[in-house]
Amino acid sequence: VSANVAPIEGEFDYIIVGAGSAGCVLANRLSANPANRVLLLEAGGNDNWIWFHIPVGYLFAIGNPRADWLLKTEAEPGLNGRSLNYPRGKVVGGSSAINGMIYMLGQAADYDNWRQLGLPGWSWEDVRPYFRKHVDHFLKSEHHGAGGEWRVEYPRLSWEILDAFRQAANEYGIPTVDDFNTGDNEGICYFHVNQKRGRRWSAARGFLKPVMHRQNLQLATGCLVEGLELTVRRVTGVRWRQNGEQRAARSRGEVILAAGSIGSPHILMLSGIGPSAQLSKFSIPVALDRPGVGSNLHDHLQLRMIYKVSGVKTLNETYASVFNRVGMGLNYAFRRRGPMTMAPSQLGAFTRSDSTQDRANIQYHVQPLSLDKFGEPLHPFPAFTASVTNIRPTSRGALALKSADPAMAPAISPNYLATPEDQQVAADSIRVTRSIVRQPA
């Protein structure tokens, strides 16, 4: 990892830990006021590798220490003791540099529920203006803005096999829609993607790079945060290791943790903020006993089903030909089109796992390809994959310290399929998949 080790002098108004999807936006917005001095810390390096910008580059980034934290879950009881890879971006841009590029807002009811739980200012109508402000969307409608930093485009290719699945979903009762981001995402359509003219449009490219000329904004890369500095239960600074040296910075305003659902609680616990029993186990002085730190982890498990097909093209047999692969490369190089612009999933759908659900509770990711697992070769036969996930699981996981060493990842336990409700939705969602593919289309 290359590191930006420019001198860090004086105090900052804001120190942001993590230059990922949230950190890049925060750095942009906070440094817009020239009176604010902002420091942005990132554990990874700069996004100057070509595969961070070619859409299919996630194939080379996930599982690569140049781009990925290489996290794994603990053995999952609900998955017969299997441990899963848990990709998280370790680069300027964070996971937006290696993810599926799908632009997806939540359901209006989800945001309204936050307000009902006691979060004023977080209802659907409250957050919509901010979504509109930051986006530059190809759809010109009341739901989307134009001219913002976050570019959203329609995918640059379609597949007959995916169109057939969409028709089958229509016959099952799932309507075709134009946009998942209107507040009610029930329906089926091609996913809209964070790309600009055929290139991945990460948070770094959209929000950070255009403002790096600001004299009041400083980015430091290769910074493994070791903990927060506290003064009488107030966070006043950050300490980190960079190029083998310990460094620190102080904040006269705020320290903002934007290190993600794993990194942020991990840093809190390393700093003595968390469950006292865990902290004491690793001889970390307890600054604030907070049992909730590291608990209540929500995650979505995808259930994949693969179907062999005939008489229709899929990526499996297309990619098998060397001639075709050369053509894909040339098509992308000269036209920014073709399979190299593909997101991991192209066609999406939201529907209900059974008739008792009051709104869509499962989501589909449909791909014109198949393989045994990520990173392995495509199958030698034509096939497509339909993955389905419960978007409101009731199972709750947790993470726990394994060591006081900041370089050692915490124990991650998503606790998939731990509740009868999630087990029922999983079974019902597979039945829905089978019902769709049995349609005449």
Q: What are these model-predicted stretches?
A:
Residues 1-12, 128, 134-182, 189-191, ...:
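FAD-dependent oxidoreductase catalytic-site/capping-region signature
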Residues 115-235, 304-328:
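Conserved redox-cofactor binding core of oxidoreductases
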Residues 33, 213-215, 439-440:
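Acidic-histidine catalytic/liganding microenvironments
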Residues 24, 198, 356:
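Aromatic-residue-lined binding/catalytic grooves and analogous aromatic/hydrophobic interfacial grooves
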Residues 33, 37, 44-49, 228-233, ...:
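Glycine-rich loop(s) and the adjacent beta-strand/alpha-helix scaffold that form part
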Residues 2-132, 289-292, 300-309:
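N-terminal glycine-rich phosphate/pyrophosphate-binding loop and immediately adjacent elements
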Residues 27-31, 111-115, 128-132, 163-170, ...:
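Non-transmembrane alpha-helical segments in soluble domains
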